[in-house]
């Protein structure tokens, strides 16, 4: 039997980052499904599957990738990110003035909530985002956190019992207590794996960088093998230069 493949590109026509993200409908999500918001996971990888180069994702990126990320942030109610990623990437300004104004016009707060899970109480208050007066940060922990009173950002700490600060519990809390309908997870690899393992990811936005990285850096997902592996359904594909931008939906 001869296998056949469908050629997807190159395809004529260009779409701006805003139009691509608008097509996902993240900003139109209403209510919650199975007690949690709709979750989109944004990730970037080298051609050999590494999520970082020299400790961060910066060396893998492309201007179009960064534009897509900011548009995704513009669309959602909240961002979920691990403390390690907050530190490594030095989170600061999330959006520009135009994106904030577009959120306000849609009846949203100027910037999305940023939620992070710090089970051991290691809240990264040194990250520039904690010094942003307009930032709203939700911290979920299972230990005694450091003081956050000196942060310019609005920081709320939620302490769970041991083993309770799971991604699923955090998503449920964001939906029930903060009215969050859509979440963008920006990693890192351990958090992404936990979300996938818990069937808490609806959309995957994967940027594939035209690089071989090798080394011992993390893969896009890190942790124990998923048994069985989780299947995805390709929904869309875009290209900028030699970078590929793939949108997958979780298979049902």
Regions found by a protein language model. Name each.
Residues 1-252:
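Enzymes that bind and transform nitrogen-containing heteroaromatic metabolites
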């Amino acid at each position: 039997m001869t296998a056949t493949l469908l050629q997807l590109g190159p395809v004529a026509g260009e779409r701006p980052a805003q139009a691509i993200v608008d097509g996902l409908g993240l900003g139109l999500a209403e209510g919650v499904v199975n007690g949690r918001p709709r979750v989109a996971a944004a990730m970037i990888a080298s051609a050999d599957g590494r999520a970082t180069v020299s400790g961060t994702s910066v060396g893998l990126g492309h201007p179009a990738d960064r534009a897509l990320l900011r548009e995704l942030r513009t669309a959602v109610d909240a961002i979920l990110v691990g403390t390690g990623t907050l530190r490594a990437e030095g989170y600061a300004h999330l959006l520009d003035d135009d994106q904030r104004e577009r959120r306000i016009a849609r009846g949203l707060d100027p910037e999305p909530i940023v939620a992070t899970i710090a089970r051991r109480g290691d809240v990264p208050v040194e990250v520039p985002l904690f010094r942003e007066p307009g930032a709203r940060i939700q911290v979920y922990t299972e230990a005694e956190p450091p003081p956050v009173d000196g942060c310019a950002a609005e920081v709320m700490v939620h302490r769970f019992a041991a083993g309770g600060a799971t991604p699923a519990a955090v998503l449920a809390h964001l939906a029930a207590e903060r009215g969050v309908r859509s979440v963008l997870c920006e990693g890192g690899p351990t958090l992404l794996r936990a979300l996938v393992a818990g069937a808490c990811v609806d959309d995957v936005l994967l940027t594939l960088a035209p690089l071989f990285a090798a080394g011992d850096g993390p893969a896009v997902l890190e942790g124990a093998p998923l048994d069985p592996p989780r299947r995805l359904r390709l929904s869309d594909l875009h290209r900028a230069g030699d970078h590929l931008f793939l949108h997958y939906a979780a298979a049902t």
